[in-house]
Amino acid sequence: MEMAYIQAENLKHKRTFTKTLIVLAPFVTALMNFFAPLWFQFNSYNWWYILLYPGFLTLTCALIEQRDNGKLKYRAVASLPVSQNKVWKAKIGVAGIYSCVGNFIFLALNLLGGFAILVINEIPLTIGIWQAAAGTACIVIASLWEVPLCLWLSKKVGIFVTVILNAGLGSVLGIFTATTSLWMICPYSWVPHLMISVLGILPNGEPVADRSAAMSFWMILLVLVISLVWFAVLSCLTAKLFEKKEVG
């Protein structure tokens, strides 16, 4: 039953800018850095998780939410004999899937670009295949909690303010706290902090000089588990609030 809701939600975005954005954002990121071959992989990842991906994720969630929250303000959905709780969770599921697909495309472009540079310029890969895959997985999981948050923000304050708050202020806050002792209590810093250990990239784009201070595997796993728990909490909370508002 839940899969039917997800399929229905996905169909709403057929031939829309939301689907285009899934491909456009990774391609723009790769293209912006391809002409600096020596640092292509490092710069691409840094630009992706610091700037392009937060914008992509936020805008994707906002566009998904606004698809039903236009002139009708969910009245069309509320009139249907469906579970409003599941309708909202389907939006979360579709946004999460789009995030995964966008990150997978970025991973493929980063590695293809790295191999192309190896062949053309004889510059070896600075980030290996498994390291890149691990880094991409960390980006997806550690940012997953933003999906229900962005959907709810979009419902309450609209696209523009949501982008400013999440992709703007949130990202800036994450950058400034990622290298401090406050990183664990600031969810926005989880991705940039993980990238220090997993990919060896500082938030300012410079490579990590001393890898001896890198987090252990279990510490990285703990952060990812906390992110998943936070995602589950926000998903259930926003779904309940949505159901109460639309049904009540």
Which role does the model predict for each range below?
Residues 1-50, 56, 210-248:
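Hydrophobic alpha-helical transmembrane segments
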Residues 39-40, 163, 168-244:
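Terminal transmembrane helical anchor/hairpin motif
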Residues 64-97:
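Helix-loop-helix units of permease transmembrane domains in multi-pass membrane transporters
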Residues 25-29, 94, 166-173:
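Transmembrane alpha-helical core residues of multi-pass small-molecule transporters
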Residues 69, 73, 109, 113-122, ...:
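Membrane-interfacial segments
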